[in-house]
Amino acid sequence: MAKTFKFIFYFWGAFVLVFVLDQWVKSLTLAGLRWQSEYLDLTYALNTGVAFSMLSFLEHNLKYLHLALIVVLFIYLFWQKTLLKTHSIAFGMMLGAGVSNLLDRFIHGGVVDMFFWHKWFNFAIFNVADVMINISVALILIQEIFKKRKKDDRMD
């Protein structure tokens, strides 16, 4: 595989993997999968907002804002290829998760959430896509920190 197209393979591989995994877990949740434990429950919630149900007052208009943000990020990444090459897996994960949640908004009227972490405190209910978005942001930050350290080491 040509080195110049390797990042595209990584991007789309991560995108598809995250999208399929998230939709699969959501389909199990919608089919009635439930589980309770001392720390974590698998349940069902439909989030019509974004994180912590913010912006839920936008109702069905939120899906169009969500769509616009994803389209803008796609365009920016494919225009700014250096950023995409550097963080292809992380952005693939992030956009796969974002598109999966967007699909939920169009099909279900909100995002299907299922994980409820409640040991010591009640945390917001979240889904696989939410976890992948957080992991992708952490990956980008870690890569940037190490890139800066390498650059600083070369300057010394």
Curated annotation (Swiss-Prot):
Assigned GO CC terms: plasma membrane
Subcellular location: Cell inner membrane
Name of one Pfam family that matches: Peptidase_A8
Any GO molecular function: aspartic-type endopeptidase activity
The keyword Protease belongs to this UniProt entry's keyword annotation: yes
Pathway the protein acts in: Protein modification; lipoprotein biosynthesis (signal peptide cleavage)
Keywords: Aspartyl protease, Cell inner membrane, Cell membrane, Hydrolase, Membrane, Protease, Transmembrane, Transmembrane helix
Residues of the active site: 113, 130
InterPro entries from the UniProt entry: Peptidase_A8
PROSITE patterns: SPASE_II
Any one biological process term the GO annotation gives: proteolysis
Transmembrane regions listed in the UniProt entry: 5-25, 64-84, 89-109, 122-142
EC number: 3.4.23.36
Membrane topology classification: Multi-pass membrane protein
Catalytic activity: Release of signal peptides from bacterial membrane prolipoproteins. Hydrolyzes -Xaa-Yaa-Zaa-|-(S,diacylglyceryl)Cys-, in which Xaa is hydrophobic (preferably Leu), and Yaa (Ala or Ser) and Zaa (Gly or Ala) have small, neutral side chains
Family statement: Belongs to the peptidase A8 family.
Protein purpose: This protein specifically catalyzes the removal of signal peptides from prolipoproteins.
Record-given protein name: Lipoprotein signal peptidase
Source taxonomy: Bacteria, Pseudomonadati, Campylobacterota, Epsilonproteobacteria, Campylobacterales
